[in-house]
């Protein structure tokens, strides 16, 4: 009862106390002296405050309702224009926010029910080998530590004072404390919050035990696993290979010589219930483009309303192909052809061609080329559980592409991607699907993706026995 009263009334009491303090302070000689002597453009601050307060009051009193309405609408328009032209797009959709049919039920109950009853199917290994995005670069500031659970491992990811990103196993080898929870960055090292052991990020060695007797050396076995890290395309990526092999390839960079520097314009993030391979496989499934993505964007992301007559006058026409890059076996390339149609007639000036380059199992660069520049959506898939992925998408554009246009590319991808999520959240994985000739690229893609699994890649059946995720 006492805690309830405190939580209910304490904020109000604090605000009342703050108001009284300000009122009392306003009458003190010190503040009066400050208002009289602190000058702005040779006029005492107190005079400025008096003029502003008087003029604002007189201005509001002299306005009609129509004038105030106009000012209100103008303010709304200015705010909208600021959001559109100056502010990056940032949208974060949690598990259950999209892709589930609630039918009046609580979101949490529906998500848990579907995940429990869903038939997983005969799954391939659950965590691929390769470069795995762990966190967005912008979310890891200097001196910050993030706790990331991904690909069956627990990571402490931090940014040192040198500006570099480091990733080590989260658990301290001393007594098992999670160093990402309360751990502090000291120089380029991570300090355990439990006993203060200090680990450097390059090799994971313990470099200091603060309470150890002077003159004694740190035990050689006092080290934590460190991971190979690169920072590229807006992501901090780690090299994950269950066989312990060193990196054999590296992701491509969004920047190229023709257009130079690429500028950031926004991020979207989704939590998806699917196997990691299914998200990549979507790029080779060209037949689904017409059925899932053909309806006009205005019809939204709910597949149940794609056939609404309200938006039947507008639609998207799609075509595409997928193939392995002949020079880089870890890269898959999808080419997408698109046109906007009105009343069934494609509008020629809207015809575009975009390219999605799948750099390994979990990183994609989706690029749109225009006569005056290039926009690229960098996509990162982070496997946090066998059937749960976090998909993050950043949009970048070259110098002469305005922010509103770059954001429109990302927003279009955002809406279309949420249509896919509604399928993924409910589907099962078919190890041996019934395919027709026109589906042949799906089989081709599965053979390509299999290179990212190896003999010791964890299986879903093994993980279910241990609940080790």
Curated annotation (Swiss-Prot):
Main subcellular location: membrane
Keyword Glycosyltransferase: no
GO term, biological process aspect, one: cholesterol metabolic process
Residue ranges of every copy of the Rieske domain listed in the record: 132-238
GO-annotated cellular components: cytoplasm; membrane
Keyword Oxidoreductase: yes
Catalytic activity: cholesterol + NADPH + O2 + H(+) = 7-dehydrocholesterol + NADP(+) + 2 H2O; cholesterol + NADH + O2 + H(+) = 7-dehydrocholesterol + NAD(+) + 2 H2O
Molecular function GO labels: 2 iron, 2 sulfur cluster binding; cholesterol 7-desaturase (NAD(P)H) activity; metal ion binding
Spans through the membrane: 58-78
Entry function: Catalyzes the production of 7-dehydrocholesterol (7-DHC or cholesta-5,7-dien-3beta-ol) by inserting a double bond (desaturating) at the C7-C8 single bond of cholesterol. Essential regulator of steroid biosynthesis as this reaction is the first step in the synthesis of the steroid hormone Delta(7)-dafachronic acid.
Name of the protein this chain belongs to: Cholesterol 7-desaturase nvd
Phylogenetic lineage: Eukaryota, Metazoa, Echinodermata, Eleutherozoa, Echinozoa
Gene that produces this protein: nvd-Hp
């Amino acid at each position: 009862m006492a805690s309830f009263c405190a939580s209910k009334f304490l904020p109000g009491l604090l605000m009342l106390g703050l108001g009284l303090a300000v009122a009392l302070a306003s009458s003190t000689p010190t503040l009066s002296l400050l208002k009289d002597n602190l000058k702005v453009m040779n006029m005492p601050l107190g005079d400025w405050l008096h003029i502003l307060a008087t003029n604002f009051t007189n201005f509001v009193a002299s306005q009609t309702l129509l004038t105030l309405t106009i000012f209100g609408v103008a303010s709304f328009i200015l705010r909208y224009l600021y959001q559109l032209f100056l502010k990056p797009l940032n949208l974060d959709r949690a598990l259950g926010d999209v892709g589930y049919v609630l039918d009046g039920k609580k979101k949490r109950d529906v998500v848990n029910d579907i995940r429990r009853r869903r038939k997983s199917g005969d799954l391939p290994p659950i965590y691929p080998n390769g470069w795995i995005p762990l966190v967005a670069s912008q979310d890891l500031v200097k001196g910050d530590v993030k706790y990331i659970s991904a690909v069956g491992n627990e990571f402490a990811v931090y940014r040192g004072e040198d500006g570099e990103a480091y990733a080590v196993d989260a658990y301290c080898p001393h007594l098992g404390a999670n160093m990402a929870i309360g751990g502090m960055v000291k120089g380029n090292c991570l300090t355990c919050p439990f006993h203060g052991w200090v680990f450097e990020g390059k090799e994971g060695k313990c470099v200091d035990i603060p309470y150890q007797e002077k003159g004694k050396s740190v035990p050689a076995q006092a080290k934590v696993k460190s991971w190979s890290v690169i920072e590229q395309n807006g992501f901090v990526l780690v090299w994950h290979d269950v066989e312990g092999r060193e990196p054999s390839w590296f992701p491509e960079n969004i920047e190229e010589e023709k257009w130079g520097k690429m500028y950031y314009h926004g991020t979207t993030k989704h939590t998806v219930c699917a196997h990691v391979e299914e998200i990549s496989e979507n790029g080779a499934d060209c037949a689904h483009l017409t059925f899932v993505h053909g309806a006009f964007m205005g019809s939204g992301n709910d597949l149940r309303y794609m056939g609404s007559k309200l938006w039947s006058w507008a639609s998207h026409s799609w075509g595409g192909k997928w193939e392995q890059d002949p020079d880089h076996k870890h890269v898959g390339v999808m080419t997408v052809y698109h046109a906007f149609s009105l009343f069934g007639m494609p509008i020629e000036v809207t015809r575009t061609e975009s390219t999605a380059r799948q750099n390994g199992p979990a990183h994609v660069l989706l690029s749109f080329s225009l006569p005056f520049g290039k926009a690229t959506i960098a996509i990162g898939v982070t496997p946090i559980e066998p059937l749960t992925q976090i998909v993050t998408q950043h949009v970048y554009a070259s110098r002469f592409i305005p922010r509103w246009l770059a954001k429109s590319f990302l927003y279009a991808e955002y809406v279309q991607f949420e249509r896919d999520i509604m399928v993924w959240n409910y589907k099962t994985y078919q190890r041996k699907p019934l395919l027709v000739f026109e589906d042949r690229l799906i089989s081709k893609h599965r053979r390509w993706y299999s290179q990212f699994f190896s003999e010791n890649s964890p299986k879903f059946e093994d993980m279910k026995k241990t609940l080790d995720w």
